Amino acid sequence: MTVRLLTNIGRLWTGNEVLSNAAILVHNDRIAWVGRAPDLPQSVPGVVDDIVDVDHVENLGGALVTPGLIDAHTHPVYAGNRYAELAIRTGGSSAASITAAGGGVGSTVTVTRGTDPWTLCNGVRERLRGWLLSGTTTVEAKTGYHLTRDGELADVRLLRELEKEPMMPRVHVTFLAAHVVPPEYFGRQREYVEAVGAWCADAAAAGADSVDVYCDEGHFTTEEARWVLASGRNVGLLPRIHAGLFSRRGAVQLAAELGCASADGLHHMSDEDIAIMSRYGVPAVVSPATALQRGHLPPVRQMIKHGVQIALGSDHNPGFCGITSMSLVIAMAVAAFGMSVNDALRAATLGGATVLGAPDRGVLAPGRLADIVQWDADHEGAFAWSFGLKPRRVWRGGTPVQ
C-alpha cells in the first residue's frame, strides 16, 4: 500500500471546480481525498490513521494541477511517413490526385505491411511515450494500416502489450480495419466489408475496446458502416464513426441510430446534423490540427451551444498530423474553434473520458484514477498562451512518470 500527499497546489483544476491552496491524497492508484489544504483531515479511514504517517509528501510549489489529459482520436500504429505528400498537398494537389499517384492511406498500408514487427513496435512505443511525457495519460489508439485480419489483430495485441510496459499511457484500442479498402479487395468492397464484420469478434477477443469505420467519400458508405459497426457492437465493442470529413453522407444519422460513442471529424455539418447529435446524445470528437490542414473547421461553438458533448483529439496520423501534445491541441482548439480555455480543457479531460466510456478518469475526485499533471504554470490560461504548455510532473495511477 502506498499513500502519497500532493500539497501546496496553487490552483487545482479538478474538472468539477477550481480550488486554490489545494491538496490531493492518493491511495495506491486512486484519489482518496481532494480539497483545500486547510481542510485536509487528520485521518482518512482505510487509507491513513494519521496524516503525518503518509509514505510520500510532495510540495508542488504553488503550481497548476489538472487531471491527466485524454487524447480521444489517434492513428499511431504505422511505419514510414508522408512528408513529401504533405508538401505536395500544400502546393495545391488534391487528395484524389495524390491517391491516384500512389499516395494517401494506401501508401502507408504498403510501408506498414513491409515493416518488421520489432521496428513497428519501437515506433509505436516512442509515440505513446511522447503522449505520456507531455501530460496525456490516456490515448485512444486505432489500428487501420495493415487491413488484413492477421495484421489488424496483431496491431490490437501490440497496443495492449505496450500499455503494460512502464511509463506508458493507458490505451483505449479501436479496431479500424474499415479505414480504406485494401488493394487486394479493389472491385470487391462488399466482400471486404463482410470480412471486417466477421473479424470484429476476433478483435474483441484480442483486446479491442471499440470499432470504427471511416464513413465518407472514397471510403465506406453508410450501409457498409452500419454492417461493420453493428457487427462490432454485437460482440461488445463500442461503435464510433469517422463522419463528415469530406462530405455529408448520413454518418451523423447513422451514429444516432446505432448509439455511437462518438462521431469524429465533422468538418462538413448541417444544422440538422447538430440537432440530431444534440437530440440523441452523440458526442463529437474534433481535431483542430487536421481541420486546419484540410481547411474546413467543424462548427464547435454551435455544437456547444446546442449541448453536444465535445472531446478533443490530436488525430495523430502519418498523413496530416504528428502531434502528441494535447496541451498544444487545447491551444489550437481555443484559437481555431473559438473555445474557451475551460471548455477546451474539459474537452481534453472529461470529454475524452466520456467518449471512451471511462468514468474513472478525466476528473480529480475521490475514487477516480490518480492520473494527475503538475504544469509549468500557475493558471489554466497558460494553455492558450504557450501553444504547448509543458508539464513539470506527471503521475499515472499515483506513480510518478520518470
Task: Please place each PLM-identified region on the residue numbering.
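Short, Lys/Arg- and Gly-enriched loop/turn segments at beta-strand edges
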Residues: P41-S43, H379-W385
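Short peripheral tails and domain-boundary helices/loops at the edges of structured domains
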Residues: P391-Q402
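Divalent metal-coordination and catalytic microenvironments
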Residues: I9-G10, I24, D29, G62, ...
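Short, small/polar residue-rich loop motifs at catalytic or cofactor-binding pockets
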Residues: E17-S20, V52, F387-L389
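Metal-associated gating/positioning segment near the N- to mid-region
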Residues: I51, H56, L60-G123
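Metal-coordinating catalytic core of metallo-dependent amide/deamination hydrolases
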Residues: G106-R125, R129, T137-R249
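Active-site-adjacent C-terminal substructures of enzyme catalytic domains
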Residues: L237-P239, S247-V363, W375-H379, V401-Q402
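N-terminal metal-binding scaffold of metallo-dependent hydrolase/deaminase domains
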Residues: M1-G46
